[in-house]
Structure formats: structure tokens, C-alpha cells
């Protein structure tokens, strides 16, 4: 009965020093996914959650991890992707924070396309099966909205149930209580 929320402190999170951040170096998405899945597995083994009723949601970096999980795992009943990156190779050229990408992936996509493919949800789209809700701010410049459309189209092309909500007038984050509540519901 009820609900349990697991807030994963996935590897690479800020504020824990260089060693912790480097756990995600050239393993972005992959390592994060392991952290999320191991947390869920622990809750299932403890008998605290029904494995058939587990969902996943995240925003920004968490949205990227959710996008990665929707294309690489069948562990969830449903997934919500909020302002998530779907393709690192094109993101490198289309964001205002290219250094962030280099800090985690180590090179640009022209010099190391393999690492960009490994860590991009769109690379794994053929494995997608989880019903997915995509949420994105209309004027997001950090993760421009075409990444949401790309993921949606990839899921639709594979027959995966997908819905998309575009928050009119918003950028990368939701700042009004009504919009925040809507994203959580």
C-alpha cells in the first residue's frame, strides 16, 4: 500500500569530489543506470516494492538517465523523461555547456564517436519497450526541445506507447508551482 520514492544519488553527482565524479567518466548513463537499477533491485529484494509497479522519472540529468533507461531496460512499468538528452553526438554541438559533455565523455564526437554512441539513448532505441512520458520546456536552451521530439519519434517508430507534454513558456526548469505539480502527477 502507498508509494515509496527512491531518490538515487547516482555516480557522478556534483559535490562529492573528483573521484566520485570520475566514476561516470566515459560511462555516463551506463553507470547511472546501474545505480538506479541496483537501488530498485534492493527495494524489490527487501519486499518493499512490487517489481511490476515500479516507475522511473527524472529531470535534466535525471531526465537523461530516464531516457537511457527507457531505451536500455525493461525494469519499469512506465518512465517519465523530463528535459532529457537523447543524443550526445548532436548535443555536443547544440548546447551552451559543451564543456560539461567533454568533462564526462572526454572528447568530441568527431574524434571518438564510439563513446557518444555508447552513452546516447537513441543508440539503444531498438530495445525500447517501456511506456514513456516525455516532458520538456518549450524554450529550453540547455537541452533544446528537438531532443524530446527525437526520442518521441524513435519510440513511436518502434510502437512504444509514448506521450509528450510541452510546457509553454518554460525553459530548462519548471518554476511555477502548477507546472511542477503537473510534471509530478
Model-derived segments and their meaning:
Residues 1, 7-185:
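Active-site-proximal cap/loop segments of hydrolase catalytic domains
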Amino acid at each position: 500500500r502507498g508509494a515509496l520514492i527512491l531518490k538515487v544519488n547516482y555516480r557522478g553527482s556534483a559535490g562529492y569530489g573528483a573521484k566520485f565524479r570520475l566514476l561516470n567518466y566515459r560511462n555516463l548513463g551506463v553507470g547511472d543506470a546501474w545505480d538506479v537499477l541496483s537501488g530498485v533491485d534492493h527495494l524489490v529484494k527487501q519486499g518493499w516494492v512490487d517489481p511490476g509497479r515500479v516507475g522511473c522519472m527524472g529531470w535534466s540529468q535525471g531526465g537523461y538517465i530516464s531516457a537511457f533507461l527507457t531505451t536500455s531496460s525493461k525494469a519499469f512499468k512506465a518512465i517519465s523523461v523530463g528535459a532529457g538528452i537523447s543524443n550526445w553526438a548532436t548535443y555536443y554541438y547544440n548546447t551552451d555547456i559543451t564543456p560539461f559533455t567533454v568533462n564526462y565523455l572526454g572528447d568530441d564526437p568527431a574524434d571518438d564517436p564510439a563513446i557518444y554512441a555508447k552513452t546516447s539513448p537513441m543508440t539503444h532505441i531498438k530495445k525500447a519497450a517501456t511506456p514513456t512520458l516525455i516532458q520538456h520546456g518549450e524554450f529550453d536552451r540547455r537541452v533544446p526541445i528537438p531532443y524530446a521530439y527525437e526520442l518521441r519519434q524513435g519510440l513511436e517508430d518502434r510502437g512504444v506507447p509514448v506521450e509528450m507534454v510541452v510546457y509553454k513558456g518554460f525553459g530548462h526548469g519548471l518554476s511555477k508551482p502548477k507546472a511542477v505539480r503537473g510534471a509530478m502527477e
